[in-house]
């Protein structure tokens, strides 16, 4: 990692400290606050239902009809990410964490009661502060160029690995209580979710998801 940080420091004008590396276990995720007040309810902005029902629909007969038939839930998809602080880097005398992430997205298909792998992504990413783009112009272009330079380095070629992308993160809005590393981890979390959406889109495009072959996703895709 020292050689990689040397390249990043040189290209972005920062100073690497080669500090202690460790893994982050979790990041606090947004959640709903539930209570026992029956008058309160959550109103979704967007509904995925194509047919609007004003009352409950009795599915007893449909459930009986489906007994013994092939399950319509054929695909199962989930994603995971592990994040690590790999260094500290300074810009304008302010120190920022450098976060690395391992993102994995997997999908299995159930055929005749047996599970088999259908599709899998394994991606390595880095998250750097937005200030590493000194000009502040077109972050997407700048960080895409830095990713290419990193992947061309002999260090990465020897290891046989490459980074999928570099994700810029902004300092937390709450400078007093917010943690800088949480901003970087959140970017990697968002990248994982977008990768899940990408896989679903590929399955749809290939015609694998339909009324007879549903996909079950662990967690939200929004």
Task: Mark where each language-model region is.
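N-terminal alpha-helical "arm" segments
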Residues: 1-60
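Short hydrophobic beta-strand that contains or immediately precedes a catalytic carboxylate
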Residues: 75-77
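Short acidic, Gly/Ser-rich segments with clustered Asp/Glu that frequently serve as metal-coordination loops
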Residues: 79-85
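Acidic, metal-ligating active-site segments
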Residues: 85-138
């Amino acid at each position: 990692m020292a050689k990689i940080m040397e390249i990043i420091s040189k290209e972005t004008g920062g100073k690497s400290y080669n500090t202690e590396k460790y893994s982050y276990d979790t990041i606090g995720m947004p959640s709903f606050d539930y209570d026992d007040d029956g008058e309160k309810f959550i109103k979704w902005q967007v509904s995925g239902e194509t047919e609007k029902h004003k009352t409950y629909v009795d599915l007893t007969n449909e459930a009986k009809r489906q007994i013994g038939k092939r399950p319509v839930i054929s695909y199962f998809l989930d994603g995971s990410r592990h994040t690590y602080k790999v260094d500290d880097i300074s810009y304008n005398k302010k120190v920022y964490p450098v976060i690395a992430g391992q993102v994995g997205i997997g999908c299995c298909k159930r055929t005749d009661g047996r599970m088999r792998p259908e599709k899998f992504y394994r991606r390595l990413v880095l998250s750097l502060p937005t200030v590493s783009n000194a000009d502040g112009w077109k972050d997407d272009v700048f960080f895409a160029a830095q990713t290419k330079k990193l992947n061309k380095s002999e260090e990465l070629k020897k290891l046989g690995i490459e980074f999928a992308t570099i994700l810029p993160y902004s300092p937390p809005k709450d400078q007093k209580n917010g943690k800088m590393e949480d901003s970087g981890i959140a970017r990697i979390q968002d990248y994982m979710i977008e990768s899940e959406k990408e896989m679903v889109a590929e399955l749809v495009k290939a015609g694998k998801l339909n009324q007879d072959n549903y996909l079950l996703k662990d967690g939200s895709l929004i």
